[in-house]
Amino acid sequence: MNPGQFDSLNADVAGDNIFLYGSGRFTLKAGEARRFSIALLVGDSYDDLTLNAKTARQIYDTNYQFAKPPEKPALTAVPGDEQVTLFWDDIAETSWDPISEEYDFEGYVIYRSTDPSFLDQQNITDINGSRFLFEPLTTITGGWAKWDLINEYEGPSDIPYTGRGISYHLGNNTGLVHSFIDSNNVINGQRYFYAISSYDHGTKIMGIGPSESSKTITLNPETNEIFLDINTASVVPRSPAAGYVKGSVSYYDSLSFIKHISGFGTGTFSIEVLDPRAIEDTNTFQITFKDKPTRYSIEDLSPIVETRVSKKNVFITLQKNRLNADRFILKNGGSTMIMGQDYLLFPEAGQVVVTDTLNSQIADGDEITIEYTYYPLWESSRLNNEESNAVFDGIKIYANDKKLSLDKEKTQWSDGSSGNYQITVGPYDGKQSNMRPADYEIRWFDSIADTSSLGTATAPFQIWDVTPGKIPFKKKIVVLDYKVRNQTWDLGESVVILEEGAGINVSWQFDIQEPINDILNDAVEGDVFYVATDRPFNNEDIYQFQMMASSIQSEKNEGLLDDIRVVPNPYVVTNILEPLDRQNPRDRGPRRIYFDKLPNECTIRIYTITGELVKTIYHNTTFDNGQEFWDLTTKDNFPIAFGIYIYHIDAGKMGEKIGRLAIIK
């Protein structure tokens, strides 16, 4: 290659030479190395090209030290009927920018396209008219699928792009989410490409504008194989199979899906199913708590069994981490080995090792069997219905803790009671420290039922601790005989619960008065006034819930097959669902239609109106997929002629379906 000559290789070697680069003269001594940089510049226009060149030069001049966007979140896409469910992790939210030296994450934005390069979404132009920014997905309500932190950053950034005259939109202080259901003009059978990009707010002091993580999907035009980045997805929406029953949480009774094994917390849980495909049948999960601060973990109680070959001083890394050491079993030749003697376990890392310092019965080359359970959710502190818990087994859990307080809604006279005293409940002296996490019953009698633990005043009632999960027991009371002072409780006087312990240890106070704006009805024997409290979770609380996997109603049911259809029908020349020819973009891609709402297992036979078999298609897929494409070719792979065709669906026990379809070319 000669200096100043850029259009010749100056070589006789033939080859597919796409790019030619040249350089001025420079010396290169024996053994010496010179580094060089190459910038490949493209642009929509000359202005766009020169601006890109300036940016490339700036990057070079700063030794490639430029603003780093947040980490890419991991995206999962779940196809549905005219919708797509997306969910992602929160790794981007702890991204550190080495230039600004701060955690500058700001939000998430979703892009959708039928083109893997997303070029049809690069619609936002700069002042030069060049397409520069990508337009976010529009939600069904008309807004952008864009969510950002609630902080001082919102709207257009204060730092415009150099030479572009436009700024990145930082969002509208919506708050963050980690899942989204796209149902805005989602067409079954159409392949969509999604990307979730994380972005930061930039640094005004340094003049660095917002940065957005890349979105890269590579498609091999010869094989149509798709290569996805971690924050992208390719999905085809579809109807579920006929008879499909979506996976869900099991209910222990008609009211609750969760079972309170132990403890006395009154907080609540809810479960959102995001990916029914990932739910395992009859899988039981256990929720446990730790205190100071309150946090909870969820254990998958279905044991995982792995077989490995032992080698001393070599760590065995299991499929899962954050193991429950109490349920960990390691067997060698059918004998259970002892932790700490035969092997060492590192539960949080999910690793086990046999070291030569142990007096172990496990020798090199022994085949060992390992059984364990693990925590898919570990020490979450999200206790206010936050939606940012990680998704596991296709579900996300929401927890709502309660502060210790009186539950005024449930504190009332029990059904069947005739008394209507107005009873005001609160901690003694109004001190929060005198509240206790318990439920009580004030049980009335027609005669003396209890005596004050301080003094000798009597009362025609008893106070019992009836907290769910405890054996009910009677509490000690102190009658505040200050109104009549006749050594007995009188209407208008108060009662205080005396707790166990050294000294005078009091808790709740009950002020019992005549009813306001009502005729007095005295309490009689058998009347009960119930006192309920809201109680926070603590380390005594254990809950369990169980999931049911998706299933198929496989018994014969004529109605299940009635909804089977062909899309489009009639087929007229083309179909918007047909893919492009990636090798020859100007040519049309392969023709296609699809059968919809099929059983997950069935045989499709297509005939001419004279009864000649055209094609047999065997449909065997997952429960959530009732879709099967046909490329409008015969069994010999020839294009079919236009006309009317008969299709027959054989679904075995579920029955049969016959229909017609029209092809107009």
Region spans (language model):
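Beta-strand-rich recognition/accessory modules
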Residues: 1-62, 499, 511-517
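Conserved aromatic anchor
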Residues: 82-102, 595
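Glycine-centered coil/turn sites that cap beta-strands in beta-rich domains
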Residues: 87, 555-603
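Beta-strand-rich modules
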Residues: 182-203
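Extracellular fibronectin type III
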Residues: 201-249
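Extended beta-strand solenoid/passenger and fiber regions
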Residues: 294-376
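Glycine-centered tight-turn motifs at strand-turn-strand junctions
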Residues: 610-640, 651-655
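C-terminal tail/sorting-segment detector
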Residues: 642-665
